[in-house]
UniProtKB/Swiss-Prot annotation:
Alphabetical keyword list: Cytoplasm, Phosphoprotein, Phosphotransferase system, Sugar transport, Transcription, Transcription regulation, Transport
Stretch forming the signal peptide: none
Family: Belongs to the HPr family.
NCBIfam families membership: PTS_HPr_family (TIGR01003)
Lineage, highest ranks first: Bacteria, Bacillati, Mycoplasmatota, Mycoplasmoidales, Mycoplasmoidaceae
Protein name: Phosphocarrier protein HPr
Amino acid sequence: MKKIQVVVKDPVGIHARPASIIAGEANKFKSELKLVSPSGVEGNIKSIINLMSLGIKQNDHITIKAEGTDEEEALNAIKAVLEKHQVI
C-alpha cells in the first residue's frame, strides 16, 4: 500500500466538478483507492458520491491511499489531476 498526504487549496473544497474528474481518473486503475478525510473517515475515490460525502473543505489535510498492482501509477495520476484542476 502506498499513500500521499496533500492539502486542499480549492476555495470550495471537493465539490461535484472535481469529484467527477477525480473519480473518472481513478476508475482507469485496478487498485483500490481511498481518500481519508481529516477526521479519519475513508471514502472510495472511484465514487463521486463517496467523495462528496466526505465534506472536504479548503485547507483540509487529506490522505490518498492506493493498494493494488498499479498503486504507484494510480497515486501519481490522481495527484496530477488534483494539481491540474487546482484542487491541491
